[in-house]
Amino acid sequence: MTPTMPTTVADVMTRKVVTVSEQDALDTAEYGMHRMHFRHLPVVTANGTLVGLLSHADLLHAASSSLSAKEAERNALILQQPVKRVMQREVLTVQPEDSLVQAGKILWESKIGCLPVVNDEGALLGMLTKSDFVRLALQLLGSDVKLSDVEDLARARHG
């Protein structure tokens, strides 16, 4: 039996997503990003509603925004700030039934790395990333390479 061709966001999205809250300290978010090798963390309320997105670039921007203090002191102070101080509040999203073609166009044209997947009420259901599209391309090309092998190779090359 031939597997069906993925056509919707739900077919390829990452369902197990690490999230942070607006009140979490930036150092908690940074640790999660580093440990899990993520570049984006969705920011959600206690009931799972998406309220923002924190990117690695947001953390770098926050760290470079206060040049007057000594570097170590500045970084310590910045990382104690809550996520809500630097997160992106205007976030492009998709829904599970949206087409992969449309979602891919949004990623490409907006020059972003991920799209949170939400339901009609705004509850986070997963994430669609550029890596999900690479994994899909490898599968469609008949590669027997597992995504975990690709991730291990990337970690070895980029630390």
Model-derived segments and spans:
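Tandem CBS (Bateman) regulatory domains
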Residues: M1-K16, H56-L92, S99, G104-W108, ...
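The conserved cystathionine-beta-synthase
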Residues: V20-H37, V43-T45, T93-K111, V118, ...
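A glycine-centered beta-loop-beta connector
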Residues: M33, L41-D58, L107, L115-D132
